[in-house]
Design a protein with these regions (language model features):
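N-terminal Sec/SRP start-transfer signal
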Residues: 1-19, 183-188, 197, 233-281, ...
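Basic-flanked hydrophobic alpha-helices used for secretion and membrane insertion
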Residues: 301-558
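Short helix-loop junctions at transmembrane helix boundaries
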Residues: 27-38, 110-142, 199-217, 607-668
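Hydrophobic alpha-helical transmembrane segments of multi-pass inner-membrane transport and secretion
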Residues: 6-33, 41-75, 99-112, 226, ...
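Hydrophobic alpha-helical transmembrane segments
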Residues: 8-12, 48, 143-148, 188-192, ...
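Hydrophobic alpha-helical segments
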Residues: 100-244
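Juxtamembrane interface at the cytosolic side of transmembrane helices
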Residues: 64, 72, 164, 210, ...
Length: 668
């Protein structure tokens, strides 16, 4: 192991790092303090997902590195065999090496994991935005689980090594490290399959507009892009190199001759390695940018959906002769809060109607109950001018009967004259309602950040009479699926988050008492939501996602760096003899270095360039999916994606600088 420390040291560091990351997530799940905090479900689910992904990646990465180590050591093991050491003795050596690897790698990883566990709990506090009663001490169950899992992986690697040695003869072992590959054929079918798969994946990513469809097709698009990447790196790169070789003016230059011929004879393995680096790099950037955008968007979502401390949503059905007394409801809220010792600084009420419509480009109407493409569907919100003022804090628009103010933009192709028509079974029903768009107002954030899958369209009408007409129209079209009318009470309080949560709990206890809601009219349900509670849930989910994204991102980055390192080291040893020959026939030191730099640049920066292209095509798909979580600010996603790409590129360049030196030292 000491003699091969150039290979074993990164392996031990990788094993320790993977062990530490796995232990941290396992310890967070096993910590009894998790069950004592609000939003613990999100942390538990995130960590369990992380453990599964980290476990799969650890198995793949460790077995990959083990395979590389065995190939590099075949000559050494073959020499032992020729000198008289039997296969049983070689197997015993490998068993001892595996034992030392387990002690140093797993043991060191557990020590690091215990230290990082405390750091992880400290890092989660600012991410989740609420206190965490973690114990932070070493977790014996997590240590046992981690040690058993990675011990099993090392046993599996040992079994594979012993099997390889058993099937080999001394001559094969002696020359195993020098076994080269035949020149690969140009596989046009694979290249065509790769181009089709990559094009199909890109097409899905760019053209999908419906968020629900984006969620369903995301993994299909990812699978197609992965297949396309592997096929094109394997077949396309070979075709490109052979085309370069046919170009005599290009090929018969010192640097080009060495680089092209050297890569061509090992292209099958190199191409798969480059594809691995590309896919892992893409995963790191997508994971970090997506989770960061989700996390940073939480503040905007909470501020928009909860303009006051409490949102009290009351639904009532006019078909059942129900009607809410807004003044009575406001009086109840004021009285109850006063009894609980919580000062109320204001209660605003907004009444609105919400149902889905089809923005039919053929008829130029907003059709209720009509069937059509999801991309033409809109979540229609209708509210009074008074409700607009309550939700936004702006002055109420002055509207005449039959007029409307459009908040945001109308669907493409629609003018100022709007007609809302009911459709039932393909036929028109009810009295169509015509509205003249008299004013244009900014979008209402309260509706824009909802979790509705359809794009919101908000119209402000003059009064409750128009709301009643529109409710009657959609009731005829949708029948049993008709929407109720909704009122929201926005309650501003002067209290701490803890007092706010206690007030909500007290309301829930008192609301079951008979006569509690006397004087508020009749209604179907009354739901109370707290800004403080939403912050706990929102940041619990988004913070858990971001923490998981960071941990898995580090693991994926570790895998990327190790694949790059071992790839460059293996190429360095394979090229060592070739460059020695070239120097003997007159190649200068400067020419050797120039040739190395050209190869390393291609090997390193082709994967990151392709990964950047993947990110650009994937942007629309990620942005659409994030709308399902309420993140509709595209600029937030743009900044997170661009920042992640820039940061990853900086790390990538640093790895390049370090690896280029290692490669050059070997061939020198």
């Amino acid at each position: 192991m000491k003699q091969n420390r150039r290979f074993f040291l990164p392996y031990l560091l990788a094993l320790a790092g993977l062990t530490a990351a796995f232990y941290v997530m396992s310890a967070l799940c096993a910590d009894p303090g998790v069950l004592e905090m609000r939003g613990f479900e999100y942390v538990m689910v995130m960590m369990q997902i992380g453990m599964f992904v980290a476990g799969v990646l650890s198995a793949v990465l460790l077995l990959y590195i083990n395979s590389f180590l065995m190939k590099q050591r075949k000559k050494e093991l073959g020499l032992y065999n020729i000198l008289g050491m039997g296969k049983g003795n070689i197997a015993l050596i490998q068993c001892w090496e595996s034992l030392f690897t387990a002690i140093l790698g797993i043991g060191g990883g557990l020590v690091l994991g215990v230290a990082f566990h405390k750091l992880a709990t400290l890092a989660l506090v600012p991410l989740l935005k609420f206190s965490i009663p973690f114990h932070g001490s070493a977790s014996l169950p997590a240590m046992v689980e981690t040690a058993v899992f990675f011990g099993f992986l090392l046993l599996l690697a040992l079994a594979l090594n012993l099997f390889r040695v058993r099937l080999s003869n001394p001559i094969e072992l002696l020359h195993g490290g020098n076994v080269g590959e035949k020149e690969p054929r140009t596989r046009w079918l694979m290249a065509a399959v790769g181009a089709v798969c990559l094009g199909a994946g890109y097409f899905i990513a760019v053209t999908v507009k419906d968020p629900a469809l984006a969620m369903l097709l995301y993994f299909l698009a990812v699978l197609l892009v992965i297949i396309g990447t592997y096929c094109l790196f394997t077949a396309g790169s070979i075709a490109l190199l052979k085309l370069l070789r046919k170009n005599k003016g290009f090929y018969y230059q010192t640097g080009h001759f060495i680089g092209v011929s050297g890569m061509l004879y090992r292209m099958k393995r190199n191409a798969v390695g480059l594809a691995n680096i590309c896919i892992l790099s893409t995963m790191v950037m997508v994971m970090l940018s997506g989770t960061l955008a989700l996390y940073l968007g939480q503040g905007e979502i909470i501020a928009a959906q909860y303009p006051a401390n409490l949102n009290m949503t009351v639904s009532f059905d006019p078909a059942q002769n129900q009607d809410l007394d807004l003044d009575g409801a406001a009086s109840l809220v004021n009285r109850f809060a006063r009894e609980q010792g919580v000062p109320v600084t204001g209660v605003d009420a907004a009444e609105y109607l919400h149902f889905n419509v089809l923005a039919n480009p053929a008829t130029g109407r907003l059709e209720v109950g009509a069937q059509g493409e999801n991309t033409d569907r809109r979540a229609l919100y209708l509210l009074t001018a008074q409700g607009y003022a309550a939700l936004t804090g702006d002055r109420a628009p002055s509207l005449q009967p039959g007029e409307a103010a459009v908040c945001g933009a109308l669907p493409e192709g629609f003018g100022p004259e709007l007609t809302i028509q009911g459709i039932d079974g393909g036929r028109e029903v009810g009295d169509p309602q015509s509205l003249h768009s008299a004013q244009a107002l900014p979008e209402i954030e309260y509706f824009r950040t909802t979790f509705d899958m359809n794009e919101p369209l908000c119209l402000v009408v003059s009064d409750r009479t128009m709301l009643a007409r529109l409710w009657a129209l959609q009731s005829q079209a949708l029948d049993n699926y008709a929407a109720n009318r909704t009122a929201v009470l926005l309650v501003d309080l002067e209290c701490t988050n803890e007092e706010e949560l206690a007030l909500v709990d007290a309301w829930a206890d008192a609301s079951v008492n008979e006569g509690f809601f006397d004087g508020t009219g009749t209604w179907e349900y009354w739901r109370v939501e707290s800004r403080a509670e939403m912050a706990v849930d929102g940041y619990g989910m988004a913070g858990g996602f971001l923490f998981l994204g960071i941990v898995l991102g580090i693991i994926f980055l570790m895998a990327t760096v190790l694949i790059i390192y071992y790839k460059q080291v293996s190429e360095g040893y394979e090229d060592q003899g070739r460059f020695e020959i070239m120097r003997k026939v007159g190649l200068s030191q400067r020419q050797v270095k120039s040739s190395i730099r050209g190869q390393v640049l291609i090997v390193f920066f082709l994967p990151i360039l392709v990964a950047a292209v993947h990110i650009l095509f994937d942007f629309n798909l990620v942005a659409r999916m994030l709308t399902m979580f309420g993140v509709r600010n595209v600029m937030t996603v743009v900044l997170c994606t661009g920042g992640t790409l820039a940061a990853f590129l900086a790390v990538y360049v640093l790895v390049y600088l370090l690896t280029a030196r290692t490669y050059y030292k070997i061939v020198k």
